[in-house]
Amino acid sequence: MEIIGIIAEYNPFHNGHLHHIKTIKEKYKDSLIVLVLNGYFLERGEVSFINKKDKTKIALNYGIDIVVELPFIYGSQSADIFAYNSIKILNNLGVTKIIFGSESNNIDLLDKIANIQLNDQEYQNKIKNFIFISKLFSQYYLLIFFFYCYL
């Protein structure tokens, strides 16, 4: 049996989330679906529109088998910390596949971006330089990616 992992905020839960769950249930009929979900606060410390209990009920009602709350200390951080700790939780729970949705449906572009972020020393050096320009991680992250890719 496959144990499928999903990482989400469900803020709010929408048709794309429902489609995601339905597609997983159709493709992996005998699977168990584990969701790592933010609680009252979201990535970068924003307050969730829906409280964690209601988000959990919605997830369970639409076919998620197990919901695990991502602790605030990780869930309110930048995307890399959010993702790293979410995946760590899923790994500790024995998840065999992690499935995510995508607006672009372009896995090659995602792979290219990940390789740049992980392996390109010039990119890493530019990130360090831009830390001093912007106060918010998300702002300098976008700035450096723009300058790196387009200039």
Spans of model-derived segments:
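N-terminal catalytic cores of NTP/NDP-binding nucleotidyl/phosphoryl-transfer enzymes
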Residues: M1-K52
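Generic structural signal for well-ordered alpha-helices
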Residues: I21-K22, T56, I87
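Active-site cores that bind ATP or allylic diphosphates and position pyrophosphate for catalysis
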Residues: I64, E69-L151
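Charged helix-capping and loop-helix junction motifs
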Residues: I50-D54, F82-N85
